[in-house]
Amino acid sequence: ATYKVKLVTPDGPVEFDCPDDVYILDRAEEEGHDLPYSCRAGSCSSCAGKVTAGTVDQSDGNYLDDDQMAEGFVLTCVAYPQSDVTIETHKEEELTG
């Protein structure tokens, strides 16, 4: 399946289609959008965002705890869309602050 991903960035919102077997960060880069990242392995918070609508599968990541995920935080480098999804990007400071 392919879903609509909307990223709400500091420069404004962007939308693109993302298959359910492609990480959101990877697809965003293919579409020409620059997002923050570091490890690309779900082991840090550089790429953190916050899901405001829809669901993702980020079971490949190990940095976020259950409480953080319950609050909607997501690591875009290890997140597959599971529905149409809206994510606020650039949330590392909010996550770690």
Curated annotation (Swiss-Prot):
Top-level taxon in the UniProt lineage = Eukaryota
One GO location term (cellular component): chloroplast
Does the record's keyword annotation contain Chloroplast?
yes
Q: What is its main location?
A: plastid
* UniProt-listed GO biological process terms: electron transport chain; ferredoxin metabolic process
Binding site residues for [2Fe-2S] cluster: 39, 44, 47, 77
The UniProt entry, under PROSITE patterns, shows: 2FE2S_FER_1, 2FE2S_FER_2
Q: Does the keyword NADP apply?
A: no
One Pfam family per UniProt? Fer2
Chain ranges of the 2Fe-2S ferredoxin-type domain: 3-93
The protein's UniProt keywords, in alphabetical order, are: 2Fe-2S, Chloroplast, Electron transport, Iron, Iron-sulfur, Metal-binding, Plastid, Transport
Localization annotation: Plastid, Chloroplast
Q: How is the cofactor bound?
A: Binds 1 [2Fe-2S] cluster.
| Gene Ontology terms, MF aspect | 2 iron, 2 sulfur cluster binding; electron transfer activity; ferrous iron binding
Q: Which cofactor does it need?
A: [2Fe-2S] cluster
User: Which family is this protein grouped under?
Assistant: Belongs to the 2Fe2S plant-type ferredoxin family.
Record function comment: Ferredoxins are iron-sulfur proteins that transfer electrons in a wide variety of metabolic reactions.
Alphabetical list of PANTHER family matching this protein: FERREDOXIN, FERREDOXIN-2, CHLOROPLASTIC
Name of the molecule in the record: Ferredoxin
Lineage of this protein's species? Eukaryota, Viridiplantae, Streptophyta, Embryophyta, Tracheophyta
